[in-house]
């Protein structure tokens, strides 16, 4: 096998592995972004734990066929980049939707959420969800609230006991 063919097979396998293991992959048409905007986008995605890769449509189509993602091929027209997120489905959706709002030409094509193809509306809905960190903070707050209430109740009982004992002490001093 020649080197060019080996490189294509390796690239196809890499795309297939990432599409198969990612929680969310978003395909986008990155036309119209200048180098500074593309660098900023890559940095934002990297900080969120998302890999952003420009891919060849033919290799992506081959990888999608091997994974059984038949509905992906019609979206593989024009320049394509894929944002692969292995952990958080909300972060790439938020970041890419923000770029769509700020750019005239950048477009989200389609997404793959845990092996199922999702449209632009579903990706926008994902971007409206709170991030993983926000959800964890709310969950911790939810666990803390009952504990704080219990501490206040117990402290209130102790405080009332101290007030009662103080009142008894003052009463005995007044009698004596």
Swiss-Prot record:
<dbReference type="GO" id="GO:0006412">
    <property type="term" value="P:translation"/>
</dbReference>
<comment type="similarity">
    <text>Belongs to the universal ribosomal protein uL10 family.</text>
</comment>
<keyword id="KW-0694">RNA-binding</keyword>
<dbReference type="InterPro" id="IPR043141">
    <property type="entry name" value="Ribosomal_uL10-like_sf"/>
</dbReference>
<comment type="function">
    <text>Forms part of the ribosomal stalk, playing a central role in the interaction of the ribosome with GTP-bound translation factors.</text>
</comment>
<dbReference type="GO" id="GO:0070180">
    <property type="term" value="F:large ribosomal subunit rRNA binding"/>
</dbReference>
<dbReference type="GO" id="GO:0003735">
    <property type="term" value="F:structural constituent of ribosome"/>
</dbReference>
<dbReference type="InterPro" id="IPR001790">
    <property type="entry name" value="Ribosomal_uL10"/>
</dbReference>
<comment type="subunit">
    <text>Part of the ribosomal stalk of the 50S ribosomal subunit. The N-terminus interacts with L11 and the large rRNA to form the base of the stalk. The C-terminus forms an elongated spine to which L12 dimers bind in a sequential fashion forming a multimeric L10(L12)X complex.</text>
</comment>
<keyword id="KW-0687">Ribonucleoprotein</keyword>
<dbReference type="GO" id="GO:0015934">
    <property type="term" value="C:large ribosomal subunit"/>
</dbReference>
<dbReference type="InterPro" id="IPR002363">
    <property type="entry name" value="Ribosomal_uL10_CS_bac"/>
</dbReference>
<dbReference type="Pfam" id="PF00466">
    <property type="entry name" value="Ribosomal_L10"/>
</dbReference>
<keyword id="KW-0699">rRNA-binding</keyword>
<dbReference type="InterPro" id="IPR047865">
    <property type="entry name" value="Ribosomal_uL10_bac_type"/>
</dbReference>
<keyword id="KW-0689">Ribosomal protein</keyword>
<protein>
    <recommendedName>
        <fullName>Large ribosomal subunit protein uL10</fullName>
    </recommendedName>
</protein>
<dbReference type="InterPro" id="IPR022973">
    <property type="entry name" value="Ribosomal_uL10_bac"/>
</dbReference>
């Amino acid at each position: 096998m020649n080197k060019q063919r080996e490189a294509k097979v390796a690239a196809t396998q890499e795309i297939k592995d990432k599409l198969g293991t990612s929680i969310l992959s978003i395909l986008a048409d990155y036309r119209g972004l200048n180098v500074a905007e593309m660098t900023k986008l890559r940095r934002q995605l990297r900080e969120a734990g998302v890999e952003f890769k420009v891919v060849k449509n033919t290799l992506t189509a081959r990888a999608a066929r091997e994974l059984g993602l038949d509905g992906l091929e019609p979206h593989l027209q024009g320049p394509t980049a894929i944002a692969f997120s292995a952990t958080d489905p909300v972060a790439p959706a938020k970041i890419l939707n923000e770029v769509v709002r700020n750019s005239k030409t950048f477009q989200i094509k389609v997404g793959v959420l845990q092996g199922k193809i999702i449209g632009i509306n579903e990706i926008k809905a994902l971007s409206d969800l709170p991030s993983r960190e926000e959800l964890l903070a709310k969950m911790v707050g939810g666990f803390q609230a009952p504990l704080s209430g219990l501490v206040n109740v117990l402290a209130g009982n102790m405080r009332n006991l101290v007030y009662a004992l103080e009142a008894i002490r003052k009463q005995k001093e007044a009698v004596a």
